[in-house]
């Protein structure tokens, strides 16, 4: 069998991102608050005491939060809150990343540890947990739930100590400070930060990815919100009833044992914890297109350009956690933030309660993946099944289970596979490709000698360009033919071996037959 795979690329020299109806800054959605009838189905939860700025210091909340033109917590308020917690708790360390946002804003984060560990020097035999919020700037319960978690840990010292016996935690509450400032989904440059995890078009994405790769977490969580008022049904009179939607990473190049741990242990516990808090949940979904009259919902996909899967491809347990909030301004904000907090706490508590199983399963999964000779998955499909989904009737606020077609990815089914290359060869004229791989934490060796020998290569036999820009590029559909050939590459070429922990990120980036490669 041929040992190496030659990377050949089509380069597209394109200008800036082009998207209709976007301006520079303040790309805000219209606000459609729940009616009094619908709002009655989302009451405040008795006994809720959230320890985050929007609730402990309500005077700091901007007026625009109530009408959907601002988030509830300005950068300086958030930073002051985090600094005060760090001053009062020796196990909390306040940091500012050594990079800035596209408009020059800071990235404060908290490192929580009971030892003298750090991002670059973590504790041995402890779980490393990465928690992030605020990826989309108009989803304020995402970062607020992270701040509420920090406040909850500070207020419950025994619980915090119990967690930190088993884990070190990095909390990046605000991934997209420019988006939060403009109260818009996008980065300042109007790129979607949650679609940039493979192509790495923006320096901000690369900087955060490098921090993530250095920390190399066992567990990661990405906090978001979903649209509250989207209607369905023949009369357009039903909406999602859930407070929370969540999903594990689904890409089939993540070790199967890690994926099963996510679904069988973490997801099941999370559902129970959400219900115990008096809240409602369902799996994360998007709307599908169907030729029938039946509603088709698509379970969270396997696409690597999404943060959940991109993080998971570093062989860790990852959850996307979404709360019901886009489009309703500050309505139900306590309940929304509580929903995010419950999910984050569930993940932490599940990991601690099952520490040996979680730690050993992930570490074994990393070793198994690193040494695997199994085929890699280039494309997959989602089997469609019948099930019900929790809905709410907007005319009377009745809750009911609505029959749907459900395209499931638990698990997805592999369609196109190929034998796992031992390595990829990259000519010295493509150092920018190598730099992107290194952002992922993928190691590339620079060869001090010329390479002469057999490789597998893909000859492109046809190319079809899309008619529109997508996130700054024109996407391309190619047909290829696999050929074996002898090549000569000069010294200074790069060898990317696949017996490394983050190799799956090389697979999805370099294999042209995956969905969104370089």
Curated annotation (Swiss-Prot):
Region (Disordered) residue spans: 53-76
Function: Extracellular metalloprotease that contributes to pathogenicity.
Main location: secreted
Location of the Peptidase M14 domain: 71-351
GO molecular function, one term: zinc ion binding
Cofactors named for this entry: Zn(2+)
Binding residue positions for Zn(2+): 136, 139, 224
Active site: 322 (proton donor/acceptor)
Family recorded in the similarity comment: Belongs to the peptidase M14 family.
Record's subcellular location: Secreted
SUPFAM superfamilies linked: Zn-dependent exopeptidases
Keywords from the UniProt entry: Carboxypeptidase, Glycoprotein, Hydrolase, Protease, Secreted, Signal, Virulence
Glycan-carrying positions: 46, 116, 393, 459
GO biological process: proteolysis
Protein name: Probable carboxypeptidase 2
UniProt xrefs under PROSITE patterns: PEPTIDASE_M14
Organism domain of life: Eukaryota
EC code: 3.4.17.-
Enzyme class at the top of the EC tree: hydrolase
InterPro entries per UniProt: Peptidase_M14 (IPR000834)
Record has Iron as a keyword: no
Record-level GO cellular component terms: extracellular region
Signal sequence extent: 1-21
Organism of origin: Trichophyton verrucosum (strain HKI 0517)
């Amino acid at each position: 069998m041929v040992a190496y795979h030659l990377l050949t690329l089509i380069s597209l020299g394109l200008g800036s991102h082009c998207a209709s109806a976007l301006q520079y800054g303040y790309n805000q959605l219209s606000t459609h608050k729940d009616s009094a009838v619908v709002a009655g189905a989302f009451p405040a939860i008795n006994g809720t005491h959230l320890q985050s700025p929007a609730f402990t210091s309500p005077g700091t909340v901007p007026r625009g939060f109530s009408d959907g033109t601002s988030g509830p917590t300005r950068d300086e308020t958030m930073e002051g809150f985090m600094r005060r917690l760090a001053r009062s708790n020796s196990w909390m360390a306040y940091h500012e990343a050594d990079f800035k946002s596209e408009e020059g804003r800071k990235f404060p984060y908290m490192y929580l540890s009971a030892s003298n560990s750090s991002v670059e020097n973590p504790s041995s035999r402890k779980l490393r947990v990465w928690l992030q919020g605020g990826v989309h700037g108009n989803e304020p319960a995402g970062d607020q739930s992270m701040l509420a978690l920090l406040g909850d840990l500070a207020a419950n010292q025994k619980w915090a100590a119990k967690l930190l016996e088993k884990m070190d935690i990095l909390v990046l509450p605000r991934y997209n400070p420019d988006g939060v400032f403009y109260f818009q989904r996008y980065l300042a440059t109007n790129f979607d930060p949650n679609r940039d995890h493979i192509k790495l078009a923006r320096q901000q994405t690369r900087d955060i990815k490098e921090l993530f790769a250095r920390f190399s977490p066992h567990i990661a969580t990405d906090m978001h919100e979903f649209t509250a008022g989207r209607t369905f049904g023949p009369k357009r009179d039903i909406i999602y009833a859930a407070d929370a939607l969540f999903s594990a990473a689904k890409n089939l190049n993540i070790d199967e044992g890690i994926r099963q741990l996510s679904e069988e242990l973490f997801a099941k516990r999370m559902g129970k914890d959400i219900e115990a808090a008096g809240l409602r949940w369902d799996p994360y979904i998007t709307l599908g297109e169907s030729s029938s009259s039946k509603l088709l919902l698509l379970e969270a996909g396997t696409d690597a350009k999404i943060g959940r899967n991109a993080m998971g491809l570093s062989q860790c347990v990852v959850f996307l956690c979404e709360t019901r909030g886009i489009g309703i301004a500050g309505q139900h904000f306590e309940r929304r933030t509580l929903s995010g907090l419950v999910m984050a706490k569930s993940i932490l508590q599940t990991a601690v309660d099952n520490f040996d199983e979680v730690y050993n399963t992930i570490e074994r999964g990393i070793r198994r993946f690193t040494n695997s000779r199994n085929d890699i998955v280039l494309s997959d499909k989602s089997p469609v099944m019948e099930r019900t989904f929790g809905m709410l009737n907007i005319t009377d606020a009745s809750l009911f289970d609505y029959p749907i077609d459900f395209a499931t990815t638990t698990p997805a089914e592999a369609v196109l596979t190929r034998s796992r290359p031992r390595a990829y060869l990259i000519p010295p004229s493509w150092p920018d490709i190598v730099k992107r791989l290194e952002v992922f934490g993928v190691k590339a060796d620079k060869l001090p000698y010329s390479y002469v020998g057999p490789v597998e290569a893909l000859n492109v036999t046809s190319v079809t360009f899309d008619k529109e820009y997508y996130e700054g590029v024109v996407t391309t559909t190619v047909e290829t033919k696999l050929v074996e050939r002898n090549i000569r590459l000069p010294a200074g070429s790069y060898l990317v071996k696949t017996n490394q922990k983050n190799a799956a990120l090389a697979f999805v980036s370099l294999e042209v037959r995956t969905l969104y490669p370089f």
